[in-house]
Amino acid sequence: SVPGKGIELADCLLSRLKIAFPNTLLVHRLDRDTSGVMIFGQTEYAQRALSMQFERRQVKKTYVARVSGEVTQKSGLIDLPLVVDWENRPRQMVCHETGKLALTEWYKLSSNQNESRLRLVPKTGRSHQLRVHCMALGHPILGDPIYGEVSTHHRMMLHSEELRVKHPENGFGSRFRSKAPF
């Protein structure tokens, strides 16, 4: 969503949007390997109003992931606090002593003995939250280059499928969707 460090990571969605829409302002981020819906502001007012909705946890976010192994339960709530793993940045890790609150609801969409498809609904927005939570459950996201297994997948199987926000001008609910390409 934003430029990374180094010339090879300079190409990103924000840079491309600024070519066509120079006033584009960042509202939130997605991990570099995550696909799907993002929202940008075209005015400072819109950017501030939308960013506040993210900060206040008023945005409903829904992701789809393919994870390793067969998930046997139908749904659940993951409540595992997260903290930066300073020795292995950008990795995050579960830490019950100093970690920040991180909550994720999940729902099984389908599964077989090799993999499962989950709907993930983060209630907080910590860095790598969904990736660490899936790994902590013993079902890392397929193709995850940091928390997953060595994989034959050409990409990380995590997709931001839906965002629901209140329009910054009129306050009406707005829903943005992008079906997962996997």
Language-model regions, residue ranges each:
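RNA pseudouridine synthases
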Residues: 1-182
